Amino acid sequence: MSKPLDHVKRPMNAFMVWSRAQRRKMAQENPKMHNSEISKRLGAEWKLLTEAEKRPFIDEAKRLRAMHMKDHPDYKYRPRRKPKTLLKKDKFAFPMPYSLTGDHDGLKAVSLHGAGVLTDALLCHPEKAAAAAAAAAARVFFQPSAAAAAAAAAAASGSSTNPYSLFDLSSKMAEMTHSSSSIPYTSSIGYPQSSGGAFAGVTGGGHTHSHPSPGNPGYMIPCNCTGWPSPGLQPPLAYILFPGMGKPQLEPYPAAAYAAAL
C-alpha cells in the first residue's frame, strides 16, 4: 500500500535518533546483513546503554517532537490496522470422541447437551447417568425390542449400591444375548436358526451363544446356530470329487456295525 503524497511522518523517538547513525555504520560494515538483523542488534545495544548515555538522544527527541507539533498541530497518529483473517477457534475442538453419523438417535441426544450438563449429571446423579448411557448404547447396537429390555434392566438396577455396574460388559452380556435371541440378522450372516437346523430336535432349540465380532474382537455377536449332535448319531458324510478322481475305495466304518461288533 503506497502512502499518500501529503503523508506526515511520525516524529522520531530517542532510539530512532540514536540508531539513525548507528544503522548506517553497521550497514557499511556488514553489507550482506539483513535490515531486520540490524534492527535486532541495535535494539540489544540500546538496552545496554546507561541513562547518562541516552540523555542526549532523549533531549533531541523531545525537541523534534515540539517542532513536529508546531508544524502539524492537527496531526494524530493513526497506525494501520491489519485485517483480522484468523478464524475464532471453537471452545471445544472435539466435543465427542467419534462422529455421530447415521441413525444413532441415542448418541445424538447425548451430544446435544453440553459438556457441563453431562458433568453435572455424572456428579449429582451418577446412577441416572449410567442408566441413560446403557440405554443409549443398547439403542445403537440392538433392535428396539432389545433396547427396551436393556433400558428396563438399567432402570431396575439403577438403585443398586454401585451406580457404575451397568458398564460391566461381562455381567450384562448374558442379559443382552437373551433379550436379542429373536434378532433376525443371525440368519443373514450365515448361521442357521435353531428351529430349522438338521439337529434341532436333538439340541432342543435352546442353544444360544455368542461369537466375537470380526471388526471388533471385544464385542460379542449373539448367535442361534445349532450345537454339535449327540454322540449316538452319525453325522452325514460328504465327498469332495476332483476331475479324474472317483469315490474312495475304503468306506468309513459305520458306527452301527462297530456297535454290533462290540
Swiss-Prot record:
Swiss-Prot/TrEMBL keywords: Developmental protein, DNA-binding, Nucleus, Repressor, Transcription, Transcription regulation
Record keyword Flavoprotein present: no
Entry comment describing in which tissues the protein is expressed: Expressed throughout the developing central nervous system, including the olfactory placodes, with strongest expression at the boundary between the midbrain and hindbrain.
InterPro entries: HMG_box_dom (IPR009071), HMG_box_dom_sf (IPR036910), SOX_fam (IPR022097), SRY-related_HMG-box_TF-like (IPR050140)
Broad class of the protein's primary localization: nucleus
Gene Ontology annotations for the cellular component aspect, listed alphabetically: nucleus
BP term (GO), one: brain development
GO MF entries: DNA-binding transcription activator activity, RNA polymerase II-specific; RNA polymerase II cis-regulatory region sequence-specific DNA binding; sequence-specific DNA binding
Compartment(s) where it occurs, according to its Swiss-Prot or TrEMBL record: Nucleus
DNA-binding region(s) from the entry: 8-76
PANTHER family, sorted: SOX TRANSCRIPTION FACTOR (PTHR10270), TRANSCRIPTION FACTOR SOX-21 (PTHR10270:SF313)
Role summary: Acts as a negative regulator of transcription. May function as a switch in neuronal development.
Protein name as catalogued: Transcription factor Sox-21
Organism annotation: Xenopus laevis (African clawed frog)
